[in-house]
Amino acid sequence: MKLPVYLDYSATTPVDPRVAEKMIPFLTENFGNPASRSHTFGWTAEQAVENAREEVAKLVNADPREIVWTSGATESDNLAIKGAAEFYQTKGRHLITVKTEHKAVLDTMRELESSGFEVTYLEPMANGLLDLDAFRAAIRPDTVLASVMQVNNEIGVIQDIAAIGGICREHGVIFHVDAAQATGKVEIDLEQLPVDLMSFSAHKTYGPKGIGALYVRRKPRIRLKAQMHGGGHERGLRSGTLATHQIVGMGEAFRIAREEMAAENERIRRLRDRLLAGLADMEEVFINGDLEQRVPHNLNISFNYVEGESLMMAIKDLAVSSGSACTSASLEPSYVLRALGRSDELAHSSIRFTLGRYTTAEDVDFAISLIKDKVARLREISPLWEMYKDGIDLNTVQWAAAH
């Protein structure tokens, strides 16, 4: 077993060797520009791009013509939300999203607010799922777009996309879904799902970083205002020379995901259950997010009376995160856990374990023993733990104000 043990697959995944192997020729001999229509170098590259587009479409049961290449899910979220909001703004300027969305959605919404759009940010229920009645109640005559992620990056809960999309359809609201964390983890069938726009990323699914895609429904046709101009690539929606090697990598990664997903999810579920069972007998341990409506890859746990930062320092041999990688550089408690109603203390003491393709039972057992040992040691030196063990209710303690 190599240290540190990587249990942070929701931050990024390694590129599958099969994916890397497929990419390499497009960095060396097959280096043509897919937009070069006058020679075989261009034709070869274009064929590779279209094959990859088909593989991405197949994983989510879409038409390849509905797949637009982008630089990743962040760009896809921006193109979908800004593109639709700006194109349809004569219909209305009200948007709906959820407080636990990824920053790529929340910051895009904030940006639109600064240009005159109005956004409703819904609170999730305590289990992290969206209250469908609250969602329905938030829709107004001028609501043009709603954005709800399929799988949450911090707590792994799966939203009821079919039901939310159904409500959007009833009210003529365009529905965008960030599915960066969903591909290869849950079945996605865009023939059936009432979804208009869906964002994908390669690097959460064992593909390379720097490449993603946006699904844009053709029937009924969804129109977007392009955010990137210059050459009219991707049917005018996203200009810029296509990164053939990245695209080939994403196609292969999504092909592998389609073929291996069912068996892989079962294996990961067993490992997640093993991890949960190993930590479940500890005192004052709380699971964040619904355990049923959840991908098997994610376990987000708060260890009460342990300071999150000191726990992270103590478990250096485990690559895990507290909060999302995009925001874990800040010392703020996770905004996702705060939105679930967790106290600052519990939000601060949370660890996100995310398992993946190369996680073994040995890795999980190592994580269990390391966490148990370090949490016990940190609690030994914690006055709060001592007070808790003495039966003092810390919520009723009157702390003296600092002078």
From Swiss-Prot:
Pfam families: Aminotran_5 (PF00266). The modification N6-(pyridoxal phosphate)lysine is found at K204. Its EC number is 2.8.1.7. GO terms for biological process: [2Fe-2S] cluster assembly. GO terms for cellular component: L-cysteine desulfurase complex. [2Fe-2S] cluster binds at C326. One of its GO terms (molecular function) is 2 iron, 2 sulfur cluster binding. Pathway: Cofactor biosynthesis; iron-sulfur cluster biosynthesis. It catalyses: (sulfur carrier)-H + L-cysteine = (sulfur carrier)-SH + L-alanine. Disulfide bonds: none annotated. Its main location: cytoplasm. Its cofactor is pyridoxal 5'-phosphate. Keywords: 2Fe-2S, Cytoplasm, Iron, Iron-sulfur, Metal-binding, Pyridoxal phosphate, Transferase. It is found in: Cytoplasm. The active site is at C326. Homodimer. Forms a heterotetramer with IscU, interacts with other sulfur acceptors. Belongs to the class-V pyridoxal-phosphate-dependent aminotransferase family. NifS/IscS subfamily. This is Cysteine desulfurase IscS. It comes from Methylococcus capsulatus (strain ATCC 33009 / NCIMB 11132 / Bath).
